[in-house]
C-alpha cells in the first residue's frame, strides 16, 4: 500500500506539521508500506500531489489541514485518509461551535462569548463571567495569539491581536487548575497525560520549546478518572470524532474537570502527547501509526 504522509500546509502551525510529518516518515513500518512525503505549500497541492497514493496519512495542523477542508477534498477524490471526517474536523476546529455542542450535551465547559469582526465587545457579559478570561482566535491552534486577561482595560488590545489571526475571537472564563489531555482511540480512552507548563499556561513555547513543560502519564484518583473518562468519551461522541482525537481538559482544585478543546489532528512526534499516552500501555510509535492506518481504513466515508 502506498501511503502519502501529508504535511506542511498554509496555517500558522506549518512548522509543527513538518515536524510531525518527518517523525511519521522516519518511524513508519517501511516493510509494510511504500511511503512518500507530500509537503503542502499551497492549497492546490492537495489535489496535484496526492495522485497515485492509496492512503493519506495526515500530519497537518491548523486551518486548511485540521478544519475539514483537506478531508473533504480527499473524500471527493476517493482517497482514504487518517482520523476524523470533514464534519467533525470543522466542528472541533471552531471553538464556538464545539462549545455550543458540548453545552447542549450537558458536558462541562467554561462560559464564553464569541465575537465576529464587526461585533461590539460585551463588557457586561465578560464581567458576569468574571476575570481573568482567556482571549484567543476561535479557529486557532497551538495557543497562537492566546492571552490571559485580568482587567477590562486589556481586553480590547487582546481582541485586536486575535483578529489579526482569525475572523472570529472567543473570550472564555479562565479556569484555574491542572491541565490534562485524554487521547481517545475508537471507543476507548488511552492513559491520561498530565501537563505541567513552566509558564502561566500551556502556550506555544510551553508546547514546543525544549523544557517548556513537563508532560507525563498520570494516574488520577478512581472517582475523578471515571468522570474524566466519561466526559472524554461523551465529548468524542458528541463531536462525531472518528479513529482518534485528543480531548484537552482542565481539572480544578476541587477536582472538577472542564473540557478545553478537542484536537482532531494532534502533534505526532514521538514526544507528542498521544504517543506519550500510547507508550503508557506499551504501544510504540510505529505501532501507533499502524493502528491509526488500520482503524482509518475501516471507516466508511
Swiss-Prot record:
Specify which residues bind ATP according to the UniProt entry for this protein. Answer: 126-181
Protein name according to UniProt: D-alanine--D-alanine ligase
- Describe how the cofactor binds: Binds 2 magnesium or manganese ions per subunit.
Reactions the enzyme catalyzes: 2 D-alanine + ATP = D-alanyl-D-alanine + ADP + phosphate + H(+)
Reported EC number(s) for this entry are 6.3.2.4
Which pathway does it serve? Cell wall biogenesis; peptidoglycan biosynthesis
**Which family does the similarity line name?**
Belongs to the D-alanine--D-alanine ligase family.
Gene Ontology CC: cytoplasm
Domain of life of the organism in this record? Answer: Bacteria
Q: Does the keyword Membrane apply?
A: no
One of this protein's GO BP terms? peptidoglycan biosynthetic process
Give every ATP-grasp domain span: 99-294
| Molecular-function GO terms, alphabetical | ATP binding; D-alanine-D-alanine ligase activity; metal ion binding
Cellular location of this protein?
A: Cytoplasm
